[in-house]
Regions:
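N-terminal loops that bind phosphate or other acidic moieties
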Residues: 1-353
Length: 353
């Protein structure tokens, strides 16, 4: 397993010269300057990530980290913990929302059992279980620091393996009943914001359930006192195996100079952990959408990312990442295939000052 410190040392800032060449290509295309907005910006950023203006985004994969959370014992979810295992196995069968969307997007879905509470079966599931779910964080740390580091390194290894197999674009996703509670706790600590401001209803909590969720987060923070300057400490004490694994996927993608799509709230919380561990990792992130969860926009602001979509989505699983992949394909269709001003013998647009 790749050592976390070695991975962090291998992450370099994106290449501004490649970005400049990609922007020059866009500006030569026979259309008004910058008229495709974020789509142009994304291709330019991807060129900088890979170090080449010749951008390729296929093959592609969405990594879904699956894990359970002991905090569900506090009544913070509408459904029981058993749902995590059921949906993880359904992912292997191609029978969840993200599976349907990934097929349209031409992406391989890679479900990873990093911490599901019971053994799961399925040919497509990567068996990487480190714990049968985290402990109840209101009673003590969700996991020990060593296990948290192993979970991050597991995510790194999954990302590296996919990149070495030729994957040019990674998406992130997750499955874990209770993971919005852990994500809200992590976000509260890293952003220095009260739990009430970053905690939402998740998969359909009542007002009473939401109050229990906030109370549980407050109890966990009071009991564990996570260090906001140490993302590993935060993840270990009030996070989850799925969050730690996703943190590793972002770091592994960055180390391989491969763009990684941030999905929604949970994915963005993990992305912030990755960037706090290694600021240069932020150069390799693309925001798919802004989650409808209360902290969705806060996290993207902290990451300095602008989402492609504002669609009111809050499903998770990687559905936002899948939804954006066809948009990137359309951007590349223009970038690679459209005539230039020189080709059609028309005077090029000039930037106005």
């Amino acid at each position: 397993m790749e050592c976390l410190h070695e991975t962090l040392a291998q992450i370099v800032p994106a290449d501004p010269a490649a970005a400049q060449r990609a922007r020059k290509r866009w500006d030569s295309i026979a259309k008004p300057l910058h008229s495709l907005g974020l789509l142009e910006d994304a291709v330019v950023r991807i060129a900088a990530m890979t170090g080449s203006p010749n951008v390729e985004l296929k093959p592609r994969a969405i990594v879904a980290m699956c894990a359970d959370h002991g905090v569900v014992a506090e009544g913070v979810t509408q459904t029981g913990q058993e749902v995590t295992a059921i949906v993880t196995e359904n992912m292997s069968r191609g029978d969840t929302s993200v599976c349907c969307m990934a097929r349209v997007a031409g992406a391989e879905l890679v479900p990873v059992d990093i911490g599901v509470a019971r053994p799961v079966t399925g040919e497509r599931i990567l068996q990487r279980n480190l714990m049968r779910g985290t402990r109840n964080m209101t009673q003590g740390p969700a996991m020990d620091r060593e296990t948290c580091v192993q979970a991050i390194e597991t995510g790194v290894d999954v990302a590296r393996s996919l990149c070495r197999s030729g994957v040019r674009l990674l998406g992130t996703g997750e499955m874990g009943i209770g993971n919005t509670t852990a994500s809200s706790a992590v976000t509260s600590v890293l952003l220095g914001v009260e739990p009430e401001r970053v905690t939402g209803r998740g998969a359909g909590l009542s007002t009473e359930g939401l109050n229990r969720k906030v109370t549980a987060i407050r109890a966990a923070l009071e009991r564990n006192r996570p260090d906001p300057t140490d993302p590993v400490d935060v993840l270990a004490k009030v996070g989850g195996l799925d969050l730690a694994g996703l943190t590793g996927v972002f770091l592994g993608g960055a180390a391989c100079r491969t763009p990684v799509l941030v999905d929604g709230f949970i994915s963005a919380a993990a992305a912030l952990c990755a960037v706090r561990l290694c600021p240069a990792a932020g150069d390799y992130l693309l925001a798919s959408h802004v989650s409808a969860e209360p902290a969705g926009q806060m996290l993207l602001d902290a990451l300095g990312l602008t989402p492609f979509l504002r669609a009111g989505m809050c499903l998770g699983e990687g559905t936002g990442a899948a939804a954006v992949m066809p948009l990137l394909d359309m951007a590349l269709a223009v970038y690679d295939g459209m005539a230039t001003f020189e080709d059609i013998q028309v005077e090029a647009y000039q930037p106005l000052t």
